[in-house]
């Protein structure tokens, strides 16, 4: 368990993150450690969220299946909605009910990420839980580059407000 704590990043009071795998090409070797991590987190945490890429192996499928909430994240990229739809279908096939999935549109308000684009993403996902995270701009990029996620979420910016609201909504849904 000390290794689990050492591999984490505390981003806000009561909110801790793990991942990603340092060497993605070795992700399949992480299946058992991910299962062990999830076992510990289930005992020690109130809620476990799993956020993955669109590339799934056994470790990702097991993590998603064991999670309380699956965040399907997309943005204004051309293939984002299609990729998100595929991930939702895959998650459904490994046993995750759609009620445990949330469509998260990232960088809302950035250039090219307006209301129409966000709505197209949400319609493609066809999930009842929809979240929009406002664009954080260069200020967010600078804070994250120095590992200061807790400070970024604590600000009075549109980004910070949207993250706090999204977290509140997800916790209420659980």
Model-predicted segments: where are they?
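Phosphate-binding loop that captures ATP/GTP phosphates
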Residues: 1-17
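Phosphate-binding/switch loop-helix module in NTP-utilizing enzymes
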Residues: 18-60
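Inter-motif core of Ras-like GTPase G domains
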Residues: 43, 56-78
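Well-ordered beta-strand positions
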Residues: 47, 69, 129-131
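G-domain G4 guanine-recognition motif of GTPases
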Residues: 74-76, 90, 101-113, 132-138
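Conserved C-terminal guanine-recognition region of P-loop GTPase G domains, centered on the G4
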Residues: 84-100
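Beta-strand-loop-alpha "switch" segments that mediate conformational coupling across diverse proteins
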Residues: 107-108, 121-150
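C-terminal boundary of histidine-terminating zinc-finger modules
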Residues: 143-163
């Amino acid at each position: 368990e000390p290794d689990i704590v050492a591999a984490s990043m505390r981003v806000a009071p009561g909110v801790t993150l793990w991942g990603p795998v340092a060497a993605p090409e070795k992700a399949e070797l992480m299946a058992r450690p991910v299962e062990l991590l999830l076992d510990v987190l289930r005992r020690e945490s109130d809620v476990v969220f799993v956020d993955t890429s669109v590339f799934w192996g056994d470790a990702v499928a097991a993590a998603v299946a064991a999670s309380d909430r699956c965040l399907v994240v997309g943005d204004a990229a051309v293939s984002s909605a299609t990729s998100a739809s595929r991930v939702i279908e895959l998650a459904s096939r490994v046993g995750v009910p759609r009620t445990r999935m949330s469509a998260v549109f990232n960088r809302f308000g950035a250039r090219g990420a307006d209301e129409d684009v966000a709505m197209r993403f949400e319609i493609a996902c066809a999930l009842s839980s929809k979240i929009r995270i406002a664009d954080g701009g260069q200020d967010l990029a600078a804070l994250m580059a120095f590992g200061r996620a807790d400070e970024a979420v604590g600000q009075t910016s549109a980004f910070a407000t949207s993250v706090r609201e999204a977290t509140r909504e997800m916790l209420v849904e659980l």
